[in-house]
UniProtKB/Swiss-Prot annotation:
GO molecular function, one term: acid phosphatase activity
Residues with attached carbohydrate: N88, N172, N367, N424
Record-listed substrate binding positions: N229, H351, V352, H353
Active site: H324
EC numbers for this chain: 3.1.3.2
InterPro entries noted in UniProt: Calcineurin-like_PHP_ApaH, Metallo-depent_PP-like, MPP_PAP, PPA-like, Purple_acid_Pase-like_N, Purple_acid_Pase_N, Purple_acid_PPase_C_dom
EC top class named in words: hydrolase
Main location: secreted
Protein family membership: Belongs to the metallophosphoesterase superfamily. Purple acid phosphatase family.
Cofactor note: Binds 1 Fe cation per subunit.
Subunit and interaction comment: Homodimer.
Cofactor(s) required, per the database record: Fe cation; Zn(2+)
Protein name in UniProt: Purple acid phosphatase 6
Amino acid sequence: MKNLVIFAFLFLSITTVINGGITSKFVRQALPSIEMSLDTFPSPGGYNTPEQVHLTQGDHDGRGMIVSWVTPLNLAGSNVVTYWIATNGSDVKPAKKRAHASTKSYRFYDYSSGFLHHATIKGLEYDTKYIYEVGTDKSVRQFSFTTPPKIGPDVPYTFGIIGDLGQTYASNETLYHYMSNPKGQAVLFAGDLSYADDHPNHDQRKWDTWGRFMEPCAAYQPFIFAAGNHEIDFVPNIGEPHAFKPYTHRYPNAYKASQSTSPLWYSVRRASAHIIVLSSYSAYGKYTPQYIWLEQELKNVNREETPWLIVIVHSPWYNSNNYHYMEGESMRVMFESWLVNSKVDLVLSGHVHAYERSERISNIKYNITNGLSSPVKDPNAPIYITIGDGGNIEGIANSFVDPQPSYSAYREASFGHAVLEIMNRTHAQYTWHRNQDNEPVAADSIMLHNRHFFPVEEIVSSNIRA
């Protein structure tokens, strides 16, 4: 009994519980988010050596992979990826195949990019490790990836969740903290990648350094990206009037496979998850292309095959931080009822440089006569995760609204990442890991219950540590 009292005292001393929610009193040490210098991740040595190698899903169902890389010169053979099934020490000689990349480059103000190669590999076997090589002659570089299991309702799969990463020393902690978890198989990235636009004239060299920084992870497992505000790069005053130019040149996706008309909104299916990516910074009003696409996309979801329905959108619809408070409100008003009616499990956002998890709530009952304008608990609603805590140069958003709203279940002003471990059609373990802890430590965790197959209330476990 004495130990129980001591535990309760310690727990309450480092948390604040308001209206059922928890505000962690853990605040990241008040140090600036110092950006790594341009030479922290130099180009690899050798002649025309590929760099900034990264992966994303290359089709709708996980049998395709887009392999991307950059070379200084566009020489013969530099646009080819060679790949084969890993034989794990077997004497059987693997059958090697080749895929040719589309190659492009771009100019931005006074910057000229290298040659950006994007090769789509199709017809891969499910749940199989592949070796792949890019480059020619003595500049060949070798990597590997593993395809997801075949689509199915009880297929286990583990996603990392990262947002607003940037390229500071804190960003480095976040990425390598995630990489130390051997379970991670693919990353859901909630927008704001390089933060090149935080530098004079949107210094495009920062896109190159970010690509090199990410390569140890992104060359081995695919990233499913949403675009954030730091990807807009709309600067007409320096002659750059085309939004998302660097982002779309460097980070393509298979948007046409989901009948989208834009790479800024699309969907993929992976294992037992159906993932929908939306754009906070593209038109979404009635009858716009994104609106029309999402309306049809939600009808296309087959929960019998992919029970876990996840939406990624950069600007959060529910956020109790003073930073960017209610910026996502107009998009929420437009689409929230669709997500509730479709029983979306999880909505992932960034933008706010802190961590927050909501209750299952909705605010869709309002009409001009009833005045119902506050969020209420709703078992059909998604849980909203704000994961803009990757570590970028702009630092932590440590000013939460007080008192904590009832819709906010847990919030904390520190850097970190999350992991979603799907177990089967009914259960998935969600954990959030702050950078200051060892990887196995989960500062916030919840066993999610699938809204389609097991729509019962979840039990929360938050382990708050000073």
